[in-house]
Amino acid sequence: MQASTEAEPIGLIGLGLVGKSIARRLLQAGHKVLGFDLSKEACRAAEGFGVGIGVDAREVGARSGVMLLSLFDSASRRSLLFGEQNLLGALRPGTTLIDTSTGRPSDLTEDHERLAPGGIRLIDAALSGSSKVIADGQAIALVGDRSADAGTYGHMLSAFSKAQYFLGAPGRGLEAKLVVNLVFGLNRLALAEALGLARQANLDLGLMLEILRSGETYSRVMEVKGPMMLRAAYEPPVARLGQHFKDVELIRHWAQDLGARVPVTDTHAHLLQELIDAGFGDLDNAAIFKAYDLRKGRP
């Protein structure tokens, strides 16, 4: 990929697991990155591999024509833009904000409409893939925009995603992401339940995973999450269980708004809540396997 020639750095707010992966890919592609995070530790870590660090979010906004947001949810974005940090007050007309976070689609649409009269474009570019997948450049970007309007930022998305799908309107990328996350989560849950049953029957779990991977039962989550489940190796997390619970709750709320039934996802949410209540929310989401430990009284 050719190096960037833009005079301004790309702004990046949020330097957690996903934000750091995005930053590394942008730097590798030759872009300049100016970032900020409320966590000083996260800022130091990103500065260590070449990210410029702003004094605050407003400095990043003032110096960037295109900004990426990698935040926890819609509330975090609204606090950043309209709350005490008041990023909006530092943005110039013509600035494009690309939100890679997973939040409520309706919130994104509302914020898009709120910002548009001031000449600020807010676009959702939800990423399908863990921080490791993003770091490898293998994520999928689900964009709430038209491809014809992506001229100012499409090359940036290409730095950390192997494919970009344009869904046409603000919020639609997030809707597609929630559908994708539903399948991801239930694939993990199905694998955990199958291995839990096999364990209870004293079957060889390594052999069972090989069998599941060899036929039509295969899913890609088996490649990484399966071995993690067998080893009970959930740290350091690639994607946190608590983060996925947040996504599952978004799916359930969206489904409720649509009048759609998601009974298996409802069950998944209850199992995740049990694990979070037991103190496992910061483990990798492969720790859904521990739900079957809890129900058998295992440690």
Predicted regions, residues:
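Rossmann-fold dinucleotide-binding core
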Residues: 10, 102-182
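Rossmann-fold NAD(P) dinucleotide-binding segment
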Residues: 57-69, 73-122
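NAD(P)+-binding Rossmann beta1-loop-alpha1 motif at the extreme N-terminus of oxidoreductases
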Residues: 1-70, 100, 131, 165-166
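NAD(P)-dependent dehydrogenase/reductase Rossmann-like domain
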Residues: 278-299
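Interdomain hinge/lid region at the active-site interface
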Residues: 218-280, 285
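Beta-strand segments within the central parallel beta-sheet cores of soluble alpha/beta enzyme folds
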Residues: 206-214, 265-270
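Active-site-proximal catalytic alpha-helix in oxidoreductases
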Residues: 136-144, 165, 169-201, 210-224, ...
